[in-house]
């Protein structure tokens, strides 16, 4: 059997693949050996004496199965971990995600007029200061603030109503006293005139 190194090289160039992927018909070695040009190789490819082998299967089925298992938390124990906790899930990334969630919520609340810009600013700074661990806690805090504000407003309104009521009562009482005084003075002046 003659060496078909040249033919293999030319075939790989013609077929645009590696030399490993070229199949030369072992029964037709003499005919293949005579082909020493690209044109001749193309003819042999057309005749089916030289074939480009198919791509070998590299299945991802096992990989997919393992990935699904890992999502459930399998194969992720202490013994499987190589990097530090910070390398596996950076603290900065967690912080960025949390800040983006909290700031998005605050922005949405401000746009929908659920909170005013002053409350927005104070809560924004508090979020930056690591006061709120997650979105739920921030929402609860906002509801609590709003409830407190509403309660204070109600109490102040009630106090104002009470003050205005007492003011009115005092005014009426003063008017009554004034009227009584005037009446007494009138009576006294009449009596004095009667005596004269």
Swiss-Prot record:
<dbReference type="GO" id="GO:0006412">
    <property type="term" value="P:translation"/>
</dbReference>
<dbReference type="Pfam" id="PF01280">
    <property type="entry name" value="Ribosomal_L19e"/>
</dbReference>
<protein>
    <recommendedName>
        <fullName>Large ribosomal subunit protein eL19</fullName>
    </recommendedName>
</protein>
<dbReference type="GO" id="GO:0003735">
    <property type="term" value="F:structural constituent of ribosome"/>
</dbReference>
<comment type="similarity">
    <text>Belongs to the eukaryotic ribosomal protein eL19 family.</text>
</comment>
<keyword id="KW-0689">Ribosomal protein</keyword>
<keyword id="KW-0963">Cytoplasm</keyword>
<dbReference type="InterPro" id="IPR033935">
    <property type="entry name" value="Ribosomal_eL19_euk"/>
</dbReference>
<dbReference type="Pfam" id="PF25476">
    <property type="entry name" value="Ribosomal_L19e_C"/>
</dbReference>
<comment type="function">
    <text>Component of the large ribosomal subunit. The ribosome is a large ribonucleoprotein complex responsible for the synthesis of proteins in the cell.</text>
</comment>
<comment type="subunit">
    <text>Component of the large ribosomal subunit.</text>
</comment>
<dbReference type="InterPro" id="IPR000196">
    <property type="entry name" value="Ribosomal_eL19_dom"/>
</dbReference>
<dbReference type="InterPro" id="IPR035970">
    <property type="entry name" value="60S_ribosomal_eL19_sf"/>
</dbReference>
<feature type="region of interest" description="Disordered">
    <location>
        <begin position="153"/>
        <end position="196"/>
    </location>
</feature>
<dbReference type="InterPro" id="IPR023638">
    <property type="entry name" value="Ribosomal_eL19_CS"/>
</dbReference>
<dbReference type="GO" id="GO:0003723">
    <property type="term" value="F:RNA binding"/>
</dbReference>
<dbReference type="InterPro" id="IPR015972">
    <property type="entry name" value="Ribosomal_eL19_dom1"/>
</dbReference>
<keyword id="KW-0687">Ribonucleoprotein</keyword>
<feature type="compositionally biased region" description="Basic and acidic residues">
    <location>
        <begin position="159"/>
        <end position="196"/>
    </location>
</feature>
<dbReference type="GO" id="GO:0022625">
    <property type="term" value="C:cytosolic large ribosomal subunit"/>
</dbReference>
<dbReference type="InterPro" id="IPR039547">
    <property type="entry name" value="Ribosomal_eL19"/>
</dbReference>
């Amino acid at each position: 059997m003659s060496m078909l190194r040249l033919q293999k090289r030319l075939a790989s160039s013609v077929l645009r693949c590696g030399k490993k992927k070229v199949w030369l018909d072992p029964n037709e070695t003499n005919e293949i050996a005579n082909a020493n040009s690209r044109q001749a190789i193309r003819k042999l490819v057309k005749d089916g004496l030289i074939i480009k082998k198919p791509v070998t299967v590299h299945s991802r089925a096992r990989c997919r199965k393992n990935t699904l298992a890992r999502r459930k938390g399998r194969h992720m124990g202490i013994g499987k971990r190589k990097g530090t906790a910070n390398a596996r899930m950076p603290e900065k990334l967690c912080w960025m995600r949390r800040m983006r969630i909290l700031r998005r919520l605050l922005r949405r609340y401000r746009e929908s007029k659920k909170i005013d810009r002053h409350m927005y600013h104070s809560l924004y700074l508090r979020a930056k200061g690591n006061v709120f661990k997650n979105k739920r806690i921030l929402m609860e805090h906002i509801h609590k603030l709003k409830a407190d504000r509403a309660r204070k407003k109600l109490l102040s309104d009630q106090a104002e109503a009470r003050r205005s009521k007492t003011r009115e009562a005092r005014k009426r009482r003063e008017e009554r006293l004034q009227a009584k005084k005037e009446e007494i003075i009138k009576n006294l002046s009449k009596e004095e005139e009667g005596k004269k």
